[in-house]
Amino acid sequence: MKVTLGVRTSAGTTGAAAWEIRAAATPGRARLLELGFFLAAATASQYGLGRPQAIGDTPTSPVDFLPEDPNDVITAALIQSALAWGTGPTVPLAYLRRIYLPATIGTGVIWTFPTGIVIPVSGSLVLWNIGTNGVVDAYAVVDI
């Protein structure tokens, strides 16, 4: 089943997560198939996609990803989005992808992963602010 969600990030602080995609303990591994994000402010920005050393703790307002097919039945909190936390995720040791975007509103990227990047059980992937960044409009497609 494919689930998706679009968000606007709220934090552009250097060395912090802009967005976390979190998987629950069930139904098992999820796979990120596509991630796109586009600058919503004219700020040169540098982002990385990676697995944090530790997931964020106590997300303040997690949002469930939505099924692409409205007939699919999905349990709450299987795949969630987090933009703020009691304690944020920690920096990835390495990045699966990284990009530098010029200070032009609407500039962005769509990363596709044909076989999917695994989001570990009870783990996450983060879009990481490598530099001081502007906010972005972002979306992700995940297969569960």
Language-model features: where?
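Surface-exposed, low-hydrophobicity beta-strand/loop segments enriched in small/polar/acidic residues
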Residues: M1-I144
